[in-house]
């Protein structure tokens, strides 16, 4: 079926909107092989969004979110990130009651981890240093120079994919 789909980086699962525009999540995500969003393909990963850039040789991008607690509300409509107001108490008809507020979280950034096939093994990298570890020490100097000369940004999927293509052709 077709529905607007999004990935919730905080709860780490895919959500979609039904015809009444209510947000829902998949009850059996393991039954879904691939999600097609426009011309992009995503796998239902274990607590992660996995985009398939190329099947053979494998090149996937794993998206994860940096999260932190949302700023807490304080008096006069302000917010604070340093106040420690995590519990509350109140008077009820039967006595004193208390509890802990739910921790609200916000996404502060998105991390990209690249998953590739190197020979028969699957390897992951996320920056220049971890990319260079895919190669023997003798080749690392050459690839380090290539990355510096071409100003490869490991936050750009397109640039990293081109770097991977060049590296497997040599």
Positions of predicted regions on the chain:
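Aromatic-patch recognition
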Residues: 1-123
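Long, compositionally biased interface segments
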Residues: 123-170
